[in-house]
């Protein structure tokens, strides 16, 4: 492909791109070996293209994308070639992070880097309790059209009783068990105090990408949950 690009009067080879995110196996040693093999291949391709003068311009772009193994690809973004190299990480989930799959995967990154609390989740979806049809079950006004569900179900985080204002953490036994198009099933111990119709439930997401694509704009709030701004999405 690189040779054909170099021969083309309409194309220019600007760099080498890869995506390591599909290699995630949630096993540190396996992940490290898989990413090393990929990046060794990427470096070899870049060096071969450089030796054959396939790159156009004075700067070569080396880029990898993914929000789980980004720390493992960085060394492979700086191959030893004649031209100047610009390494670019295309990780996107760091913008909002999450309370689910990336929260778990980040723990491995933090262990490898020797840090903690490096990213904080910043995206929540709030829903109202619409019905309590039976003990231990509440139906929320939030579903597959509103929140991500492809990797994990949302996580119940906060509870604000009707008219009270302040939020509180939900009891640890509260779980989302299923989603319909427009409803979420919140389960809790039937013999305990549960939410009532009109209460608000704050949900944490798992996988920011498939929540962003459901909203054309998002309110921005301060620490007291007052809306202070808004952002539009183009996902």
Outline where the language-model segments fall.
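C-terminal accessory subdomain/extension
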Residues: 133-235
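Active-site loop/helix belt of alpha/beta enzymes
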Residues: 1-113
């Amino acid at each position: 492909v690189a040779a054909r690009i170099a021969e083309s009067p309409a194309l220019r080879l600007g760099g080498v791109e890869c995506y390591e995110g599909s290699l995630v196996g949630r096993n540190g040693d396996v992940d490290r070996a898989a990413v090393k093999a990929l990046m060794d291949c990427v470096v070899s391709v870049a060096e071969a293209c450089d030796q054959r003068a396939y790159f156009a311009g004075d700067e070569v772009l080396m880029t990898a994308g993914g929000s789980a193994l980004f720390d493992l690809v960085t060394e492979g973004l700086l191959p030893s070639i004649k031209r100047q190299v610009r390494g670019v990480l295309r990780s996107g989930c760091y913008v909002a992070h999450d309370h689910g799959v990336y929260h778990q995967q980040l723990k491995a990154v933090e262990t490898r880097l020797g840090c903690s609390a490096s990213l904080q989740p910043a995206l929540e979806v709030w829903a109202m309790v619409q019905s309590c049809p039976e003990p231990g079950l509440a139906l929320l006004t939030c579903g597959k059209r509103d929140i991500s569900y492809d990797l994990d179900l949302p996580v119940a985080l906060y509870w604000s009783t009707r008219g009270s204002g302040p939020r509180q953490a939900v009891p640890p036994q509260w779980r989302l068990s299923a989603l319909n198009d427009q409803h979420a099933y919140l389960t809790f111990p039937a013999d305990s105090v549960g939410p009532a119709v009109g209460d608000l439930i704050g949900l944490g997401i798992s996988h920011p990408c498939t929540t962003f694509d459901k909203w054309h704009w998002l309110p921005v709030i301060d620490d007291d949950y007052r809306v202070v701004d808004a952002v539009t999405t183009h996902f």
